[in-house]
């Protein structure tokens, strides 16, 4: 009887572990899919947007510099955030920042608002660039090469597809629709990340074994 109960408990634990890893896998890949989309969905539309909102080539140049600047800032602040809040909660916050920035900028009618909210989205994505590799190491240490390949493949898809579809969508439905279409990806990433954070509660700060360091 004791052996049977032990076997059943082991099977339940193994099944829960598999479900947990599948949830983390979905969370990582969905976030990876949008780590470049705020840039590549916007860049092809800047000239069209500038005609409606009213900014010139100098501002378009500023938009071009934002990814480098915000990714650099993210690289500086992320180690402190993960040290304080843990990898999972920091990643969830990054997803939320990406969603808010990408969604809210579609309603902007001012250059300043578009710039600020793009910065917020880019900061979230920059944090994602930093935290995903250690998350892969934490949850898939036995399959780092495979997971890294999957992550890079999805990242490339998220870089290429928005750039290819931005102008056709904008021509058909307007630039705001074209931008908001790609908000659906980080929104989809929210649910699994909320689940990961809940499952990790009580452990996310104590375990720093795979966290990024400055």
Write out the residue ranges for each language-model feature.
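Flexible cytoplasmic inter-helical loops of multi-pass small-molecule transporters
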Residues: 2, 6, 194-214
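Conserved MFS/SLC helix-loop-helix module at the cytosolic interface between two early adjacent transmembrane helices
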Residues: 73-112
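Extracytoplasmic
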Residues: 24-57, 75
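A generic transmembrane-helix signature of 12-TM secondary carrier transporters
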Residues: 95, 99-102, 117-118, 183-190
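Cytoplasmic helix-loop-helix junction between adjacent transmembrane helices
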Residues: 118-155
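Helix-loop-helix hairpin linking two adjacent transmembrane segments in secondary transporters
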Residues: 142, 150-201
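Residue-level signature of mid-helix packing/kink "hotspots" within the transmembrane helices
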Residues: 40, 68-76, 159-160
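Short hydrophobic/alpha-helical segments at membrane-entry points of transmembrane helices
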Residues: 27, 112-118
């Amino acid at each position: 009887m004791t052996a049977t109960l032990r076997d059943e408990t082991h099977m339940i634990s193994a099944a829960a572990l598999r479900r947990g890893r599948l949830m983390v896998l979905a969370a990582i890949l969905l976030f990876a899919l949008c780590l470049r989309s705020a840039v590549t969905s916007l860049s092809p539309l800047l000239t069209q947007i500038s005609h409606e909102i009213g900014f010139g080539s100098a501002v378009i140049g500023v938009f071009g510099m934002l990814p480098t600047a915000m990714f650099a800032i993210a690289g500086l602040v992320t180690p402190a955030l993960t040290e304080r809040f843990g990898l999972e909660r920091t990643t969830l916050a990054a997803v939320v920042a990406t969603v808010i920035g990408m969604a809210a900028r579609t309603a902007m009618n001012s250059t300043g608002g578009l710039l600020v909210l793009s910065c917020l989205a880019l900061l979230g994505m920059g944090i994602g660039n930093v935290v995903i590799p250690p998350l892969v190491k934490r949850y898939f240490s036995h399959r780092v090469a495979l997971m890294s390949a999957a992550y890079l493949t999805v990242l490339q898809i998220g870089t290429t597809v928005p750039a290819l579809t931005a102008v056709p969508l904008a021509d058909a439905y307007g630039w705001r629709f074209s931008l908001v279409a790609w908000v659906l990806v980080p929104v989809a990433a929210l649910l699994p990340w909320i689940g990961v954070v809940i499952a990790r509660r009580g452990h996310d700060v104590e375990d720093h074994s795979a966290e990024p360091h400055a």
